Amino acid sequence: MRTIYCGQLNKSHLGQEVILCGWVYRYRNLGRLIFIELSDREGRVQVVFDLTHPSIFSNAAKLRNDFCIQLHGIVRTRLDKQINYNITTGEIEVLATNLTILNSSQPLPLDINFHNNEEQRLKFRYLDLRNPEMAQRLKLRAKITSLVRHFMEKKGFLDIETPMLTKTTPEGARDYLVPSRVHKGQFYALPQSPQLFKQLLMISGFDRYYQIVKCFRDEDLRADRQPEFTQIDVEASFINAEQICKIMEDLVRHLWREIQEVELENFQYMSYTAAMYRFGSDKPDLRNPIEIVDVVDLVKNTTCTILADIAKDIKNRVVALRVPNGAKLSLNDIKKYEKYIQTYGIKFIIWMKVYQGKDGVKTTQSSITKYLLPEDIMSIIERTGACDGDILFFAAGNNNIINNVMGALRIKLGCDLKLNRENSWAPLWIVDFPMFEKDDEGNLHAVHHPFTAPKNIDIPTLLQYPLKAKANAYDMVINGYEVGSGSVRIHCAELQQTIFSILGMTRNEQSSKFGFFIDALKYGAPPHAGFAFGLDRLVMLLTSTENIRDVIAFPKTTTAIDLMTEAPSIGNTIALKELSIEILDKNKI
């Protein structure tokens, strides 16, 4: 029905007859001339109807915005004063020689040219996607997936599909369950990831696997998380951590080069401990110059008893954040930040403004200056690197709480004061994660997942000191977002069973939940490692948006509702009966 897309027309097509299909983006009737802008996925072009074709002109007079049409026309140049530099086709226009109205349109319930509220956009998503900005994001997503496929194929990876209906396994989040009609009272689970299947493929001899795959997690949502999401899933045999990281790093460099036309700087390597200690986060945004600095040794002997008492306990930290040019913050500004950190479990922060006098000597303004010796103040200034016009924020308390509080405050200050380097990328690898950590009940759980291999530790030592074990895992972080995660896998059945035991799983439970996998490891399982990117998050970064819903064609809300189709919905009574499912009164549960 068409010979070319609207947005692809240019001066090389002058004099040619073209057939275009699309929607009326803008309509102007000047009496003897009718102008429309015709829009399709590639862009817009101006079309002119004049009285040389009376029947066509009469038909064009019926047009309104968002009518779906087909037209024939001749490409011609515009006069210089009529060139529209806001669109790529602005130097040319099409003189219509034929017009077919394919479908009329009611007035749209939203305006695709202006900002609409999120609820309206999601309810009428099919119209929201006509917005050129939204369309461009989805086109870039398609290009990114194409680039990924070509890259992985060149590296020798095979695209192999894994099941969508599988067995529920403990991977951190809740599973989405699918009841079986044939096997009453039993359920499939939608996969949180293809983790076990891709490891089984390694045992099968398919030494390089990848898949762009849907995954499902029933967890609390936020701006960069959806109940169903897409992974670039990767696994390889006879490979170590450095080698798989190099391949994944090369892939990311390739994407940034092709999409952003940027050569990424070198990827730093940083341990989990260092990241938490310096930035209060395992996914630090290194564009932000603020860093957490430990000053516990400098305040141990202060007469400020609150700080001194906290500093004496090795489980605590006393830290400072240096905020460049932060001395301009008013007392009201500081109170807002004090209120902000209280939501993280800290009752107060202490501040100190730093100035440099005419004599070159640094002076301070702070409520705690009187409790500190002059030499201690100078030591704090020297250690934090504070300069004229900076402000220092101090906090003290339990290690983990302080890391969380000051990490969050660091991010907020960086955003509020626009301290992050603009138009830059700060990629890094976070490594040497703890293998296990304790939950609120004191039970151990895997920091990544239970199939991650520990780093340089034998089984007896692992059993005796599980919290000292480091995971052979690695996360890729870009601008404060974890874009991907991976690890070297366990390929020994005995070690895998040991990990399950440490996590409190009995041998019977292991056999029931993972017996097939443990058995598979006994048949010559090769050393292997893997990685998975969150495709949605990658596309979000590459298209410079802050909401993952902007790069998904039909996303859910933060309460996991599809406003367009009104899913989830109440189950059909007959279908529920066939599945032996009874809906309980939620007030009685």
UniProtKB/Swiss-Prot annotation:
Coiled-coil residue windows: none
EC number: 6.1.1.12
GO biological process, one term: aspartyl-tRNA aminoacylation
Annotated compartments: Cytoplasm
Keywords of the record: Aminoacyl-tRNA synthetase, ATP-binding, Cytoplasm, Ligase, Nucleotide-binding, Protein biosynthesis
Region spans: Aspartate: 195-198
Main location: cytoplasm
CDD domains attached to this UniProt entry: AspRS_core, EcAspRS_like_N
GO molecular function: aspartate-tRNA ligase activity; ATP binding; nucleic acid binding
PANTHER family: ASPARTATE--TRNA LIGASE, MITOCHONDRIAL, ASPARTYL/LYSYL-TRNA SYNTHETASE
Protein name from the UniProt record: Aspartate--tRNA ligase
Organism: Baumannia cicadellinicola subsp. Homalodisca coagulata
Phylogenetic lineage: Bacteria, Pseudomonadati, Pseudomonadota, Gammaproteobacteria, Candidatus Palibaumannia
